[in-house]
Amino acid sequence: MPKNKTHSGTAKRFRVTGSGKLRREQAGRRHILEKKSSRVTRRLEGTEAVAKADVKRINKLLGR
């Protein structure tokens, strides 16, 4: 059976950690930031772990 191809859009949005967990950027910090408080924009900094329900599907899209 042939290998699955990596979904390039998914590959750009998710990172695999050394232990194999998935990380993602948080939504809501790209534009229209003027009306958002500094507290909100700081809270959206950094990455977050992918929800347990989504891990299997994302791994499949990443060809893992």
Curated annotation (Swiss-Prot):
Name the Pfam families for this protein: Ribosomal_L35p
> Which keywords appear in this protein's UniProt record, sorted alphabetically?
Ribonucleoprotein, Ribosomal protein
Please tell me one Gene Ontology term that the record gives under cellular component: cytosolic large ribosomal subunit
Family label: Belongs to the bacterial ribosomal protein bL35 family.
Q: One GO BP annotation here?
A: translation
Q: Which residues fall in a compositionally biased region of kind Basic residues?
A: 1-15
Q: What is this protein called?
A: Large ribosomal subunit protein bL35
Q: Which SUPFAM superfamilies match?
A: L35p-like
One example of the protein's molecular function in GO is: structural constituent of ribosome
Region Disordered: start and end of each range? Answer: 1-27
Task: Kindly list the organism's lineage.
Answer: Bacteria, Bacillati, Actinomycetota, Actinomycetes, Pseudonocardiales
InterPro entries with a match to the protein in the record: Ribosomal_bL35 (IPR001706), Ribosomal_bL35-like (IPR021137), Ribosomal_bL35_sf (IPR037229)
HAMAP family attached to this UniProt entry: Ribosomal_bL35
